[in-house]
């Protein structure tokens, strides 16, 4: 199993180009099922999850080529099924449900691995599709959905759900009549999907707000689209500059998507300047301890919680971090404590007391963002840190070790434990 070996203590200096957003690319790829023909996407990151979605679409009959452009031809869809062997590795696979049902009238999609419907937002997808006229049954771990043609409805989400908003918005594009979605997610990735659907001929208004209105059309046509920059990757590298006392310029990013993150990182003592597609960050003073609470966009994102916690481990006081989106999203805490962090957990709260330094140690990544938090802590720690199970990183960070090495990090990938 591959691992990262990091010798910390080097301030990062230089330029990092931010990749396209995985969380924008995946729903765009699912949207290709809505229209027969060739869809073309640029700025698509080369990540494990992108490869998995290509395999899933390929299983259905679509063909894909990922060079400088990701081309998907959905003209030969024949298998209206998302099998467990593919869905189990990526929860975003459920995004094919709405498009398949809307265009073909049938979908058989495996429940994501370990998913208890009552406790996970997938129930919001299913109840919304039922309100649009779908007949849905659960059979042997699969969602089986049928509808001659979906019909418009007014749907109020009990909780803000990004993938639920995306799934029902896609389904509504081909439904009969008007669909009104209320309490919708406002994330930039939702807006990007709506932008592409409009290029395909969809009639959508209100994306970026808490109410989206979709007037169904008879047919959509393929188009081209550039994937928006990854705001979480950008936030991660800003935090990396902060925790190492470095100076970085980030290019190919969208500062407007990072306002809540930048506000908190400035409060933590970082000097951050923004321009068109650019963020300049410098850290040359003490890290100030700052409290955060995660909440849906435009508030502080849960996907930056772990990385911010790493920064706070070296703060000059006490930071209270409250996770309000997901349960059990403090799995990185035990590993950070192995590096010398002083953190106490109390339910959804983490109390982080800043320490003078972290010390390298063997640690294990538990999920995507936890992996990034361990990399940041290792970059600042004295001595050598070895991080195992780094396949999590490959789900969401394109060439992270290469990008960090280019700005001065002493980092190397050790293949197969050799």
Swiss-Prot record:
Lineage top rank: taxon: Bacteria
Gene Ontology molecular functions: UDP-N-acetylglucosamine 1-carboxyvinyltransferase activity
Subcellular locations according to the entry: Cytoplasm
Biological processes per GO annotation: cell division; cell wall organization; peptidoglycan biosynthetic process; regulation of cell shape; UDP-N-acetylgalactosamine biosynthetic process
A Pfam family: EPSP_synthase
Active site: 115 (proton donor)
2-(S-cysteinyl)pyruvic acid O-phosphothioketal: residues bearing it: 115
Catalysed reactions, semicolon-separated: phosphoenolpyruvate + UDP-N-acetyl-alpha-D-glucosamine = UDP-N-acetyl-3-O-(1-carboxyvinyl)-alpha-D-glucosamine + phosphate
Cross-referenced SUPFAM superfamilies: EPT/RTPC-like (SSF55205)
Residues reported to bind UDP-N-acetyl-alpha-D-glucosamine: 91, 303, 325
GO cellular component, one term: cytoplasm
Predominant localisation class: cytoplasm
Chain sites annotated for binding phosphoenolpyruvate: 22-23
Enzyme Commission number(s) of this protein: 2.5.1.7
Enzyme class: transferase
Key words of the record: Cell cycle, Cell division, Cell shape, Cell wall biogenesis/degradation, Cytoplasm, Peptidoglycan synthesis, Pyruvate, Transferase
Pathway involvement of the protein, from the record: Cell wall biogenesis; peptidoglycan biosynthesis
Listed CDD domains: UdpNAET
PANTHER family, per the entry: UDP-N-ACETYLGLUCOSAMINE 1-CARBOXYVINYLTRANSFERASE
HAMAP family: MurA (MF_00111)
Function, as annotated: Cell wall formation. Adds enolpyruvyl to UDP-N-acetylglucosamine.
Similarity comment: Belongs to the EPSP synthase family. MurA subfamily.
Record protein name field: UDP-N-acetylglucosamine 1-carboxyvinyltransferase
Phylogenetic classification of the source organism: Bacteria, Pseudomonadati, Thermodesulfobacteriota, Syntrophobacteria, Syntrophobacterales
Gene name per UniProt: murA
């Amino acid at each position: 199993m591959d691992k990262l070996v990091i010798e910390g203590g080097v301030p990062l200096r230089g330029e990092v180009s931010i990749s396209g957003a995985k969380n924008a690319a995946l729903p765009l790829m699912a949207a290709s099922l809505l229209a027969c023909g060739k869809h073309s996407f640029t700025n698509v990151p080369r990540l494990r999850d992108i490869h998995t979605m290509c395999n899933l679409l390929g299983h259905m009959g679509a063909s894909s080529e990922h060079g400088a452009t990701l081309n998907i031809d959905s003209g030969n869809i024949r298998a209206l099924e998302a099998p467990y062997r593919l869905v189990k590795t990526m929860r975003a696979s459920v995004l094919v449900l709405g498009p398949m049902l809307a265009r073909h009238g049938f979908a058989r999609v495996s429940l994501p691995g370990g998913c208890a419907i009552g406790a996970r937002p997938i129930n919001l997808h299913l109840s919304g599709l039922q309100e649009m006229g779908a007949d849905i049954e659960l059979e042997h771990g699969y969602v089986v959905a049928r509808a001659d043609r979906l019909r418009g409805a007014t749907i109020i989400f009990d909780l803000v759900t990004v993938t639920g908003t995306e799934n029902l918005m896609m389904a509504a594009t081909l439904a009969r009549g008007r669909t009104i979605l209320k309490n919708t997610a406002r994330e930039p990735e939702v807006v990007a999907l709506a932008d592409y659907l409009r290029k395909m001929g969809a009639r959508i208004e209100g994306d970026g707000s808490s109410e989206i209105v979709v007037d169904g059309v008879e047919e959509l046509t393929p188009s081209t689209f550039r994937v928006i920059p990854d705001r979480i990757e950008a936030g991660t590298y800003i935090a990396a500059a902060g925790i190492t006392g470095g100076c970085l310029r980030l290019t190919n990013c969208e500062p407007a998507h990072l306002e809540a993150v930048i506000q908190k990182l400035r409060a933590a003592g970082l000097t951050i300047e923004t321009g068109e597609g650019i963020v300049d960050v410098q850290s040359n003073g003490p890290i100030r301890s700052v409290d955060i609470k995660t909440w849906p966009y435009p508030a502080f994102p849960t996907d930056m919680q772990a990385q911010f916690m790493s920064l706070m481990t070296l703060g000059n006081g006490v930071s209270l971090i409250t996770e309000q989106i997901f349960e059990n999203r403090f799995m990185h805490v035990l590993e950070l404590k192995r590096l010398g962090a002083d953190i106490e957990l109390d339910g959804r709260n983490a109390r982080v007391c800043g320490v003078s330094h972290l010390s390298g140690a063997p640690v294990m990544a538990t999920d995507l963002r936890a992996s990034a938090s361990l990399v940041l802590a290792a970059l600042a720690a004295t001595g050598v840190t070895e991080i195992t199970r780094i396949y999590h990183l490959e789900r969401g960070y394109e060439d992270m070790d290469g990008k960090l090495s280019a700005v001065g990090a002493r980092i190397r990938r050790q293949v197969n434990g050799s």
